[in-house]
């Protein structure tokens, strides 16, 4: 049992780290710089630690810039103000993200400038064979080490960690919590759950000062 719980918690925080550090702070906001080799290393590490949840740094970065530009308007890729359920919001998010990541939608230059892009690797990492490979690896870990039947209930969550991380912030941190700053959107600080989110729940602060680390 302990091995599965360690695996689950480690996967949660490692996948979240690469989402917040590489995809969010670096790809979206250029809060710091990387050389081309370091950047490619982070692409690969993101694929390893997000696994079946891999998010394209380009797709994520562009969409997140659009979120800040259009926060809580009809053009926001994900706003609880315009979607009546968390599931509808996340499906809309997935649709927009997929179109950007695959090149089906070409956003304005202001959203794409400087966002890291490695098309060959991204296409591979987002592919179904890649996702199925990681999914099979997770199933194998559970098969070998899940000593209690209830532990298998954790497995579906591991297939969906990245969307779960996004839903916590983009739904709950726009509906619940407190505000330090009056901004032109509904962002809030959702601190009771920030132990799960590595600082991402300071969402109102982030919407006020988006480029700060």
What are these regions (language model features)?
Residues 26-27, 171-179:
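A cytosolic-side transmembrane-helix exit/cap motif
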Residues 1-168, 211-213:
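Non-catalytic, topology-defining segments of multipass membrane proteins
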Residues 54, 112-119, 176-209:
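Active-site-proximal inter-transmembrane loops
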């Amino acid at each position: 049992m302990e091995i599965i719980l360690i695996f689950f918690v480690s996967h949660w925080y490692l996948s979240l780290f690469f989402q917040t550090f590489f995809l969010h702070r670096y790809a979206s906001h250029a809060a710091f710089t990387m050389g081309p080799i370091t950047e490619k290393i982070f692409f690969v590490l993101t694929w390893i630690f997000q696994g079946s949840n891999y998010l394209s740094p380009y797709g994520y970065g562009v969409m997140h810039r659009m979120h800040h530009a259009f926060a809580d308007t009809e053009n926001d890729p994900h706003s609880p103000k315009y979607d009546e359920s968390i599931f509808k919001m996340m499906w809309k998010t997935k649709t927009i993200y997929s179109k950007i990541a695959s090149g089906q939608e070409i956003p304005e230059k202001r959203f794409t400038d400087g966002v890291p892009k490695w098309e060959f690797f991204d296409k591979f990492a987002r592919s179904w064979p890649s996702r199925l490979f990681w999914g099979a690896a997770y199933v194998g870990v559970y098969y070998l080490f899940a000593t209690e039947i209830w532990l298998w209930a954790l497995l579906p969550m591991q297939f969906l960690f990245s969307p779960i991380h996004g839903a916590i912030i983009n739904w709950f941190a726009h509906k619940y919590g407190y505000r330090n700053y009056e901004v032109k959107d509904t962002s809030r600080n959702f601190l009771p759950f920030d132990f799960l989110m590595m600082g991402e729940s300071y969402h109102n602060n982030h919407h006020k000062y988006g480029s700060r680390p």
